[in-house]
Amino acid sequence: LSPGLSYGKDEELDLENLKKKYAQLQSVGFKDFAIFFDDIESERGEELGKMHGLVMKELSGFLEKDSSSSLMFCPTVYCNSFANDDISNSPYLKGLSETVPNNLPMLWTGKQVVSQYIDDQEVEELHKIISNPIVVWDNYYANDYCPTKFYVGSYRGRNITEKAIQGIGLNLTGLPLTDSINLYHLKGDMSTEEILKEFGVPQDFNVLMPFFDGPFKNSPELNTLEDIQNLINLSQELCVKWKSPLQLEWSPYLW
């Protein structure tokens, strides 16, 4: 649930409504829950952090009545850049750390919303501010901020170990087969070429691959009209001759 846009106008009533929603979901079999306080257009101050921590404390106590339930959360400050690149002086994280139960996993995207690199040292710096277990909420393959693109290249720039984090969650595209390719990348035991072959992608796509590799890979320069026309012809050929469910996902991006 994402209650942050309106939460706080009547805190007591809002909290009771949240508990009712969770109880309703529990009654039909849901066990694992998350609260998202991201993308709230308000000052990221200490009082907001304290309030969010108290909400999590109340919900955690409520859900603990069912020992099989789990709860995690995404804070409003979920990357370094939202703390002006200085998490040690973030009023929001300070307030949050004072009230949130420290056993609840917290989502974090790294230095940026879409981070080029994430490593253990960054997580260690975060743990100096707040001790909650960290789940990396990784936007490496996300395309909601660039809906005319998708990425299916290798999973790069991550040097994080199990000792530093509780887990990794990929924020993907919503395209089921494309997302399956990227889950193969996360698993890490096959090359990009092997994965694309596994999914029946024609070899001709390898020519276009540099344009769909990853968010931090520079696309090749197209210096002549002939270069551009050759790519257009290849894209059209893939759209017309290649027939598969994956092609249906990719064709709007290839035309």
Describe the function of each predicted region.
Residues 1-18, 27-31, 64-65:
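Feature activates predominantly on carbohydrate-active enzymes
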Residues 4-7, 39-43:
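A short, flexible beta-alpha/helix-coil linker loop
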Residues 11, 118-119, 224:
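A diffuse structural propensity rather than consistent per-protein peaks
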Residues 15, 78, 86-88, 208-211:
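Bulky hydrophobic/aromatic packing residues
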Residues 21, 31, 40-190:
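Catalytic-core regions of glycoside hydrolase
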Residues 189-255:
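C-terminal functional modules
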